[in-house]
Amino acid sequence: VLVVKRPKGINVHPIQRGGILTREAREALLEWADGYSVCDFCFEGRVDLIQKPPILEFKEEVAEFLGMDDVRFTAGARHAKFAVMNSFRGTVVLDSLAHYTSYIAAELSGLKVYEVPNSGYPEFKVDPQDYAKIFDKVREETGKYPSLALLTHVDYRYGNLNDAKRVGEICQEYGIPFLLNTAYTSGVMEVDGKKLKADFIVGSGHKSWAATAPIGILAIEQNQAAKVLRTSLTRGNWSGRAFTKKEISLFGCSPVFGLPLITLMLSFPTVLKRVKRWEEEIEKVRWFVREMEKIEGMRALGERPRRHTLVQFESPSFHLIAMKHRRKGFFLYDELKKRGIIGIHPGMTKNFKLNIYALSWDEIGKVVEAFKDIAEKYGIEVED
């Protein structure tokens, strides 16, 4: 019998903090774990139209929460991005720190990619005005403006919070549909699509909405719904079979039939409340960065002051230890695990990412003390 157990401790994994299940969601795991568990009372052939459990009502609540007109649930944020991009032809402009799945979705959809540059080391910031410059460049080179623009609200590498509203305004000025990837923002901080001028919002339930994986959220403005949510026109030439309610960009019916959707629903009341506490999370991460940078050589990359709880550090002092240690880069993971801290990628010392979202002040203090203790053990200077 194969038995796999996860390590225990304070989890600072950069892609897991916002997906930690609520008590209500965790209690439902066994009851809803079997296959297509939400489909007992499916009469319309689509998961988003099921009324028992109240998925139809829930998607309307999520649309209101995001300030958008309609919502679908998808097999992760990557599926949501593909559903949008597959409805366009030509070119897409995206930020140069976009997640790899944004590029893959574009490639699979036959879209040519143009990147908006960032400022490089050490802040890696994206200037919203550069979207206009790239739009003009695309027209100059192809004869047409881009079909679509994508902005990663908070990038997965440095945790920079980009100016979505300004990019949305620029997209409106040019008449280019705007896709906002909120995988690391919606669900942990307030996101209002109408205020941000977004035509599409993509979210990640397992990254930021306290749900099991995989589940994404696709929110759409009404003027784009017919384009992206178009239904099947196929009819079998011999059988005459047709599937007129099936939305083709969502594979007819999104594969989110059990725990992903149920946990998303059960965690939603908590999500509604926790986005109101974002300022406290920012207060925590700014204190955390100040304390971590008391370790010799430790430096947070990305924008300052910090506006998100995901942080990448460069740590040349730990890397020097790793070069001489018998465990090489794994020594840091080992030392943290001994002190009850998990989630740092094994083998990483030159740079590493972590996320302290929703940790208590006491837990954050323990993380800081663990790093300082390791530094002192190996002769790295730590400020008082």
Label each region the model flagged.
Residues V113, F178-L179, A300, G343:
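Hydrophobic beta-strand scaffold residues
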Residues G76-A80, H99-Y100, Y121-F124, A183-V188:
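Short acidic loop-to-helix transition motifs that present clustered carboxylates
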Residues G205-R307:
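Active-site C-terminal subdomain of aminotransferase-like
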Residues G90-P146:
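PLP-dependent aminotransferase-like
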Residues F124-T182, S186-G187:
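Active-site phosphate-binding strand-loop segment of PLP-dependent enzymes
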Residues P14, A25-N86, L97:
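Conserved N-terminal alpha-helix of the aminotransferase class I/II PLP-enzyme fold
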Residues D192-H206:
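Conserved active-site segment immediately N-terminal to the catalytic lysine
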Residues L2, E283-I380:
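Conserved C-terminal alpha-helix-loop-beta "cap" of PLP-dependent enzymes
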